[in-house]
A protein has these predicted regions:
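Domain-level signal for soluble alpha/beta catalytic cores
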Residues: 1-170
Length: 170
């Protein structure tokens, strides 16, 4: 009889704690600095990593606590993209969501100051030895021919191939 090997994975996106929601609101209202917001976020990430490890996970995430959307925050912070308000909202389980989206506004490139770098460095710093930290990033397919996100490529690129090459590199 052969032994069945199971493989499990998790995205690592957790519900945002109330303390983080409140800190984000205070930051948005100018009541606290970004540094103060990150202090709250970091403490909650540290607690989450402890919880993940305590519950047997060998691969941990930061809960995506630094994001407002699982995918758009990553794209907004690449060079060559911008956030904008679209007319219609996303539909999720029949409910309307925010209308924020992303579109091209220049040549696409890696942003060396992307906040995901900082967040991942912090995650690594609070991850115990023998445990693997991970981050989830969206694939290029979330740009290509979706929600008109790639419609403006010809404003900045001579060819579709050049656009795809830069997108893949970023």
């Amino acid at each position: 009889m052969s032994k069945v090997h199971y493989h499990f994975d998790h995205v690592g996106s957790y519900l945002r704690p109330q303390a983080l929601k409140e800190a984000r609101e205070k930051f948005a209202n100018g009541e606290i600095s970004q540094e103060e917001l990150l202090k709250v976020q970091d403490e909650l990430v540290k607690e989450l990593v402890h919880h993940e490890v305590e519950n047997g996970l060998q691969v941990v995430s930061d809960g995506e606590f630094g994001r407002s959307w699982w995918h758009l925050d990553f794209l907004w912070n690449l060079t060559g993209f911008e956030a904008y308000q679209q007319e219609d909202s996303y539909k999720f389980h029949g409910a309307k969501t925010r209308t924020t989206n992303v579109r091209i506004n220049g040549k696409i490139a890696e942003n060396p100051n992307h906040p995901f770098y900082r967040d991942f460095e912090y995650l690594k710093s609070v991850t115990p030895e023998g445990i693997t930290p991970k981050v989830t990033i969206p694939s290029p397919s979330l740009i290509i021919n979706r929600d008109h996100r790639s419609d403006l490529y010809a404003d900045y690129y001579d060819s579709w191939t050049d656009f795809l090459d830069d997108l893949a590199k970023a």
